[in-house]
């Protein structure tokens, strides 16, 4: 695709990546999806503030609230509330993630800013990287309340080491994001 201009905002402290797992009985394991109102409101507020400052037009929450009514429902409700109460000037939509994936690969231009919980954000960020050439050309950042880290996402590529194939573009674009952040 040419001209894809997406921003992906991912809550990355909760969800299934919280690491709350246990073995219920031999051969049966369980992971717990964690969602707190505080974290959901924090990322929604940050996303809308960021989109507004960058003069973006629309935020889309991709979710599975039709199935995960409590966790994804809370995430969606917090985003909807932040929109209604603080940023009604921005367009807002919610889309079931399955349909959102299909729409993304069919026509990514219909999206502007994507707001996702942790696992979905991990998967969708890779999908979107594929739309523009792969992980090697996509910048990344982890924005905290006190500290931020700007990085080329997904680490190293030892499989192409020494072959003169790697591109520093993701690192350079992440550096540009860092400089624009301050």
Residue ranges and their predicted role:
Residues 1-38:
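Flexible glycine-/small-residue-enriched beta->alpha junction loops
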Residues 104-182:
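Glycine-rich phosphate/nucleotide-binding loop
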Residues 23-27, 75-82, 132-141, 145:
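A glycine- and small-aliphatic-rich helix-loop capping segment at beta-alpha/alpha-beta transitions
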Residues 5-6, 13-14, 22, 45, ...:
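Non-catalytic beta/alpha edge segments that cap or flank active sites
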Residues 2-5, 13, 54-57, 87-90, ...:
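Short coil/turn connectors at secondary-structure junctions
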Residues 7-11, 62, 116-118:
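Short beta-strand segments
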Residues 25-98, 110-113:
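Glycine-rich phosphate/diphosphate-binding loop of Rossmann-like nucleotide-binding domains
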Residues 18-22, 70-75, 104-107, 127-128:
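Short acidic, glycine/serine/threonine-rich loops at helix termini
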